[in-house]
Structure formats: C-alpha cells, structure tokens
Amino acid sequence: MASKGKVTQVIGAVVDVQFEDGLPAILNALETTNNGKRLVLEVAQHLGENTVRTIAMDATEGLVRGAAVSDTGGPITVPVGNATLGRILNVIGEPVDERGDVSKAEARAIHQPAPDFAAQSTESQILVTGIKVIDLLAPYSKGGKIGLFGGAGVGKTVLIMELINNIAKVHSGFSVFAGVGERTREGNDLYHEMIESGVINLEKLEESKVALVYGQMNEPPGARARVALTGLTLAEQFRDQSGTDVLFFVDNIFRFTQAGSEVSALLGRIPSAVGYQPTLATDMGALQERITSTKAGSITSVQAIYVPADDLTDPAPATSFAHLDATTVLSRAISELGIYPAVDPLDSTSRILDPQVVGEEHYQVARDVQGMLQRYKSLQDIIAILGMDELSEEDKLTVARARKIQRFLSQPFDVAKVFTGSDGVQVPLEDTIKSFKAVVAGEYDHLPEAAFYMVGGIDDVIAKAQRLAAAA
C-alpha cells in the first residue's frame, strides 16, 4: 500500500510533504496532481515530524497546501529500450513530441549505482569515428568521456550529428542525446535536422538510431538537474541489451551543474566556492562514473562544455575536466578559413594518443603532423610581415606541406550535404594514418593545395587533382 501524504509548504521548486506514516526514502518519486496534470516530486531531505522536502520536476504554479500526494515506492522510472528510438522524452519519461504514448514494457529507475569493478572493462580501445582529424590527433576511446569545447556557430551540433550518423553506420550502435538546459529552439532544430538526415525515421521509428531526452532552459531546476540521468539510463539499457557501443551526448554539462546549484540553494545548503553547491564533485562523479565500458558493451560520452566567461578555473568546468579522456576544441579561426570540421589540431588532446594504445606508427604520424602545424603557426608572423620569399627553402617546404595538411584535415559530412553539395565520407583509420604519413614525407608535394580540401582519403586527393588539371 503506497503511503499517502499532503503538501504543507510550496517555495518555488521546493515542496514539503507531510506523511501520516511510512516516510518515503531519499530519492523516491512522489506523485500529485497540479492543474489536472501529473506532477512528480523527488525526495531530497527528511526534515523530522514525518515531513520530507522534495524537488519538483515541473512547474509548481497552482499547487496548494493540503493537496494529496502518494509515494511511488521507488525512484523516478522511465521507459527504456527500442520503444524510445526516434522519440523525445522529458525528465520523467513522458513523450513531448506529440506522437502518442511510449511503451513502458521496459522501464528503469534513473538512479543506478555505477557498474562494479568486476563488471567493468579496463582495456583501452580506440573508437573509430571515420573523422580524420579526430581519429588521427585526438582519438576517442571506447567508454571514454570527451569534452567538446566551442563557441556559438563553429559546428558543435553538426559534429555531434555526424558522430551519431557514423556510429550508426560503422558500429550499428545507438545514440542518446540529452539536452540539458539548452534553448528550446536548438532542440527543435536538432530534431528536424535528424529527421532530414535520416538519423530519425518517422515512417519506421524502430529503425531510428537515436533517442532524445530534453529538459530545456525554461524547465524548473529539478528537471534540469535530473534530465542527464534520464538520458544516461536510456544509454545504459541500450548498452546492456545490445552489447554494442552506445554514444551518449550531453549538451550542455555546465547546465547540469548550474541546475544543481539552484536546487542546492533552494534546499538551504551553505554554498561553496563561487556560489556552487557543496556537493558539486559528488553530483558530477555520480553521473560520470556510470558512463563506462562493461564487458557487455560501452557508453562513450561526448559532452559539450560551456566555459563561463572563458575561465577554465571556474569550479564547474574544472570539476568536469577531471573526468575527461579526450578534448575536442572547435576553433573559430579555423572555421573562418572554411575548414570543417573546425577542430583545432594543436589544442585538442586525448589520453589514448599513446604508442601503447594506438601503436607506434599512429603516434609518430600524429606527432609529426602536429609538429609541422606548430612550425607553420610560429612562422605565420614572419610571413605576415615579410612575405613567403624571406623564408628559407626548408621553411617554405614546411609551410607548403602544413597548408596541405590543414586542408586535408577538412572532410565532407553526410549531415552537412546541404551546405557542401558533396556526399559525406568516413575514412578508415589505416587510410588516415597512411595518407598523412605520405603527405608529411613529401610524397604528394607535386599536387596542388586545392586538391586536399574537403576530400576523404589520399585516393580522393589524387582523383581531385586530376579533375582540377583537366579543368585547367
């Protein structure tokens, strides 16, 4: 028999509920009705005198003292599995895309312990994305966590969509996208772009490759603080049921921290540095430790990270850095050159760019490419002031090769076909290593720079050079 209680106090997103008997456990979901709609409350504190303090997962306008509340007996539970593919859910697992109900045949609680040590897979393996600049210079590891840094309009969303597309094609895996405190318009745009690019199939939803979970900026802090966990729960189910590699996107992980800080203040906890919640590291750890590889499969997470006031020492981004295995930095300067994806080859890093994981050849080629690009960067001031003619012959050669490498790091994407007019390509890792090794060694010095722009492997470069020569 579910315990019954009544609302005794409403302060914004915080609701106090008093029970006659049978106090619900911390993190239990309570249900009440507000304006005829189901409202879920999550227990956060026990106050004594049979009263619990809860966080509301939706707006509390209209909720009154004395309203009846029932305990569900467990944490918030959401539908999971194939029924969620191609759908948009909210924090409590209700569909918000106006396409009917989602089957609750498979359901999971959003609060789960991290897999224990015995279940985790510890070997480092590269997750091949088919995107040259990432695979070569800042490779992603299976079950790793990747931070995606970039301002507005440099291509974060396009890169995220291409990764979803490639994981579906190359690894036939699923993706889960959690929109945490993002703009509703961006969420809507992403949904429609996914339909256009075929990642979501409206005719046959079960053939879609992605499930979406949204808690936008206008939602109360309770929803924004929990929506990342809802998305992660969906990803865990895909990993465990299919044993494949699952991609889990969070946009934006900073909003998760921000919502936690709002909730913390409402609960009356004393804030720590810069006004953040005292439990900042615990909250982040509880989310990040669940993102891991098990012997069944892996969850690889790509997290967009907003850096407040570009201050990397701010506690919110600084806490997330500790968990990251790789960083992909998108640069406005590179996007202005028309080079997409606009990944900065010198700023992006990866823990697994190590000869013992990726192999000696891959490591050496990556370091040679970065060395050449770094030399070009240091020569740019001289070129700007004195011109190319003042450089030594050796430096002229370095600059010529570096410019070819810079263009060769660009690549047409499937999801950006409408902008580029050319079909996207996924480049196998072996081809990427072989191609860049040859370019660094000077085997293609005779080919024009333009032949290296927006192509796949080196064979495409040669074919493009022949087309350019014929056209000339």
Curated annotation (Swiss-Prot):
GO terms for molecular function: ATP binding; ATP hydrolysis activity; proton-transporting ATP synthase activity, rotational mechanism. It is an enzyme of class 7 (translocase). Keywords: ATP synthesis, ATP-binding, CF(1), Hydrogen ion transport, Ion transport, Membrane, Nucleotide-binding, Translocase, Transport. Gene3D superfamilies: 2.40.10.170, Bovine Mitochondrial F1-atpase, Atp Synthase Beta Chain, Chain D, domain 3 (1.10.1140.10), P-loop containing nucleotide triphosphate hydrolases (3.40.50.300). Its EC number is 7.1.2.2. It comes from the Bacteria. Its main location: membrane. The keyword Transport applies. ATP binds at G150, G151, A152, G153, V154, G155, K156, T157. InterPro entries: AAA+_ATPase, ATP-synt_VA_C, ATP_synth_F1_bsu, ATPase_a/bsu_AS, ATPase_alpha/beta_chains, ATPase_F1/V1/A1_a/bsu_N, ATPase_F1/V1/A1_a/bsu_N_sf, ATPase_F1/V1/A1_a/bsu_nucl-bd. It is found in: Cellular chromatophore membrane. It catalyses: ATP + H2O + 4 H(+)(in) = ADP + phosphate + 5 H(+)(out). The keyword Protease does not apply. It is a peripheral membrane protein. One of its GO terms (cellular component) is plasma membrane-derived chromatophore membrane. Produces ATP from ADP in the presence of a proton gradient across the membrane. The catalytic sites are hosted primarily by the beta subunits. HAMAP family: ATP_synth_beta_bact. F-type ATPases have 2 components, CF(1) - the catalytic core - and CF(0) - the membrane proton channel. CF(1) has five subunits: alpha(3), beta(3), gamma(1), delta(1), epsilon(1). CF(0) has four main subunits: a, b, b' and c. Belongs to the ATPase alpha/beta chains family. This is ATP synthase subunit beta. It comes from Rhodobacter capsulatus.
